[in-house]
Amino acid sequence: MVSGHNPQDAEAKRQPFAQAAYGTVGLETLLSVLLSLHHAHGLDLATLIRTVTGHPARLLDIDGGTLRAGVCADFALVDLEAPWIVDADALQSKSKNAAIEGRKLQGKVEACFVNGQIIFDSKMEIKK
């Protein structure tokens, strides 16, 4: 499972349909959209997490997607219950075109760490 995240700035999207750049925000909404499968349909949480962590890492032959000694500590802190509404203007991506604009989601990333260093905190926005 991947986001297909391919953000485009407003000018690239403000073209006749056939000439407009393709792409939409996906990275910032992927986990919350997947969590909707957990909340609404009972998808096992461990399976969901493996789908976006360990499985892609193995497919790409990346030593990651897991928390274990000797592997970079890349992880997210998630509030599984936090409700929020997708507001493209509030997203951090350069793209403001969200296919799910206005959709109510449950579950929100509160912080992200790469190699053990915080790069995003929902209270303070992007660090790096």
Task: Give each language-model segment a name.
Residues H5, K128:
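Catalytic pocket of metal/acid-base enzymes, prominently hydrolases
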Residues N6-A82:
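His/Asp/Glu-enriched, well-ordered alpha-helical/loop segment
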Residues P16, C72-K127:
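C-terminal cap of metal-dependent C-N hydrolases
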Residues M1-S3:
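Hydrophobic faces of well-ordered beta-strands that scaffold small-molecule active sites
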